[in-house]
Curated annotation (Swiss-Prot):
Domain of life: Eukaryota
UniProt xrefs under InterPro entries: GDSL (IPR001087), SGNH_hydro_sf (IPR036514), SGNH_plant_lipase-like (IPR035669)
Pfam families linked: Lipase_GDSL
Cellular component, GO annotation: extracellular region
The keyword Hydrolase belongs to this UniProt entry's keyword annotation: yes
N-terminal signal peptide: 1-22
Single Gene Ontology MF annotation: hydrolase activity, acting on ester bonds
Family that this chain belongs to: Belongs to the 'GDSL' lipolytic enzyme family.
Keywords: Glycoprotein, Hydrolase, Lipid degradation, Lipid metabolism, Secreted, Signal
Protein name, UniProt field: GDSL esterase/lipase At1g28600
The organism of origin for this protein: Arabidopsis thaliana
Active-site positions on this chain: 38 (nucleophile), 340, 343
Amino acid sequence: MASLDSLVIFLFSTLFVTIVSSETPCPNFKSIISFGDSIADTGNLVGLSDRNQLPVTAFPPYGETFFHHPTGRSCDGRIIMDFIAEFVGLPYVPPYFGSKNRNFDKGVNFAVAGATALKSSFLKKRGIQPHTNVSLGVQLKSFKKSLPNLCGSPSDCRDMIGNALILMGEIGGNDYNFPFFNRKPVKEVEELVPFVIASISSTITELIGMGGKTFLVPGEFPIGCSVVYLTLYKTSNKDEYDPSTGCLKWLNKFGEYHSEKLKVELNRLRKLYPHVNIIYADYYNSLLRIFKEPAKFGFMERPFPACCGIGGPYNFNFTRKCGSVGVKSCKDPSKYVGWDGVHMTEAAYKWIADGILNGPYANPPFDRSCLRSEIKKESLYNQSTLTQACVKL
């Protein structure tokens, strides 16, 4: 009987791919606290910008698919964090900067497009010019300053942070993008990786000290598949490309390098803080599977041009980007993986989010028992639909 019980438990956990260690906390998340860059920005860069110098994300066709107007998201619609919010039954997370009379009871977002993990002064000393001074450290300081308004007393704030799902990015991508855009040697950019990882780790550690119990920490994307890099580093040497994806192999190897170093550091933190649930989100492989089998996920075949752009083999031009006058989007963004040459479409982000939330691209997997019953039913229905129909959710 004991062996039969064990088998049943094993099969149950395998079917739903959601069981985490019994030592980890299992809250019904009451809010989402977010840090990061454009992958998670829901309007902060727009909020921080001069009204006469707004970023392209403040203009159509950004936001056309779901919100039907620009929201400051670097996407045609929802981003990964929006699908995470839906999954845990919370509202979309509002941006903190530039917000007036916003309700942050269910979440607050400090992610800013262009943000780096490292201080701007650190990068400038190395000849790297970031587009914003709002680094991860600045975001954390802003969060601390906001606490009296968000939660009141220290004990209330500790409870709030402890009951939140804390999303750590993606962050660090811009620390690498800026030097790569200037064609810095890969070995030189690799030297930044330990510093980027240390910045992410120290921020997590500080938030744990403030009461944080559940963290979702994404790795790097397969940047060799990004339209901006395929355009910038276009070459006639076919050996530079992965024949299974059409992506630049050396850039993808760099993305893997960052992600592997991050996973090592997260394992170290787990040993130091066994009461904290630190979930690694494998953005790399959750997206790479789409490039390997685009038709399976409802996307057009290679060469994976940007939906919104103009010119060149990938529909991308550095001087006339999406959101600029005269630059239009494609008729059906759901058939495209890439949105504007740098970021993905809502359709691609939904698949990435599904890979994280429903498996197998989160370690440890999300614990479905943490979700309210109505959310569980909806997620299971969506997962079943996705598996049976194999169409875009």
